[in-house]
Amino acid sequence: MRSSRPFPFLLSTLALTAATLSLGSAMAHAAVVEGGGDVPPVSHAPMGEVAVRRGVQGPAGLFTARIHLLVNASKNEFGKPTSLAPDFYYSLTDSVQIGLLHTLPMGWQTLPGAGLCLTGSDKGCATVYNNVGFDFMYGLFYGDVHLSFHSSLFLLRAPDPLPAGVMWTVGLSGKLHFTDAVALLFDPQIGISLKDRDAYKDMLYVPLELQLQASRAVALKLLSGVTGQLSSLGDTYQVPVGLGVVANLTPNLDLGLRFSFDNLLGKVPAVPPGLSRTDLRSLGLLLTIRS
């Protein structure tokens, strides 16, 4: 029998999101600027510093490479798999950004195995090259509330005999600035399967980052969110919890590290038999290059 819990769970999620948006708007100290033209800078600091104060898109002409090394750190499975997932972004204007992705819609919290899998089929790699995505963002608001329309098209590869998949995601990416040093990054998206819908289900992705500017060059992040199948969200939702740190080394270079419990607060059946919630873990190394 189909569970009746997804609908109340989704209502609760939407209510929490609405409350958070209202709180962020109430705490804003500067006017919100609509996108479409030149966007005023949020900081005159060198590129990469005071990153928490910045928005979700780069200024016109900025090229950014975010290179992720994703490592399974689960009990008895360390490094199985390990994958390399580079993301590339280019800002055509202050309001329009395009990208080529190898992470999935959970961003930095994408699980190991995405992108180019390095450890072989006997160590957790279903295929060598698992997914690629094409990303588009359009800035709507700037200031103490950054908000962008966000959409991606993902091509998903599966091991034989499973078919390849195509998923289109649509949502809003934004950042609520509570102070100059504290912000909440959110990027909720609905993933719609465009091919082989029996094998690939429509999905919900809600990555969240609570960001704290510890110093001009160092940002701390509390990572969480929700992901699951829309048709059975109450039975499939997963909630990761993690910590991350990103250090700005030069105006062109950042280095980051995260550690996550991949389903610390999610649905229990997602945990394989014999493992506890804390046994499912992953590491993410991040190298960011700007030019």
Q: Where are the model-predicted features located?
A:
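Transmembrane beta-barrel domains of Gram-negative outer membranes and organellar outer membranes
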Residues: H29-K195, D202-S291
